[in-house]
Amino acid sequence: MANALKEKYVNEVQPALIEKFNFTSPMQAPKIDKIVLNMGVGDAVSNSKNLDEAVEELKLIAGQQPVITKAKKSIAGFRLREGMSIGTKVTLRGARMYEFLDKLINISLPRVRDFRGVSSKAFDGRGNYTLGIREQLIFPEIDFDQVNRVRGLDIVVVTTAQNDEEGRELLTLLGMPFAK
């Protein structure tokens, strides 16, 4: 079963991008490469149970097993030692990536309180888009009663676009609700 968002990309978005940017080959049209979800759990330093909860929540959100990230440097002010587990991340590609993006755009983002669209300024100069979510409760897989603590997460949409203009156009055509 092909994903609706993938079909939309192939049938509508890719031809529109080729026409707008005058590409000579369909392979030049930007596409989504991967989506990385990252959840920093700074309080895992004092209580490792918090990290286990974050891993479980990210597993439910992404539908795939996350990896635990470790501290690169020791920082005395944060009581942090090099190699301590301080976060979790998961990289989505292929069908799961399109399913997640579809779910994010159509279900999760509209559930954000006072939602007026996502910032159109969060591009990195190379066509990749970063989005911060303040609470994991906007995802339908997370059960409100099971959550001990509200945590945020970062979502990075990595594209093959050469610049921000191409990346913004790609995400706009896919349905990302940018603020006006």
From Swiss-Prot:
Please list every transmembrane segment annotated in the UniProt record, as residue ranges.
Answer: none
> Please, one GO biological process term?
translation
Q: Which UniProt keywords apply?
A: Ribonucleoprotein, Ribosomal protein, RNA-binding, rRNA-binding, tRNA-binding
Q: What is the annotated signal peptide range for this record?
A: none
Query: Which molecular-function annotations from GO does this UniProt entry contain?
Result: rRNA binding; structural constituent of ribosome; tRNA binding
Matching entries from PROSITE patterns are given as: RIBOSOMAL_L5
A family per Pfam: Ribosomal_L5
Q: Name one GO cellular component term.
A: ribosome
Which InterPro entries has this protein been placed in?
Ribosomal_uL5, Ribosomal_uL5_bac-type, Ribosomal_uL5_C, Ribosomal_uL5_CS, Ribosomal_uL5_dom_sf, Ribosomal_uL5_N
Write out the similarity annotation.
Belongs to the universal ribosomal protein uL5 family.
Q: What does this protein do?
A: This is one of the proteins that bind and probably mediate the attachment of the 5S RNA into the large ribosomal subunit, where it forms part of the central protuberance. In the 70S ribosome it contacts protein S13 of the 30S subunit (bridge B1b), connecting the 2 subunits; this bridge is implicated in subunit movement. Contacts the P site tRNA; the 5S rRNA and some of its associated proteins might help stabilize positioning of ribosome-bound tRNAs.
Q: Which HAMAP family does this chain map to? A: Ribosomal_uL5_B (MF_01333_B)
**Subunit structure, interactors included:** Part of the 50S ribosomal subunit; part of the 5S rRNA/L5/L18/L25 subcomplex. Contacts the 5S rRNA and the P site tRNA. Forms a bridge to the 30S subunit in the 70S ribosome.
Q: What is this protein called?
A: Large ribosomal subunit protein uL5
Q: Which gene encodes it?
A: rplE
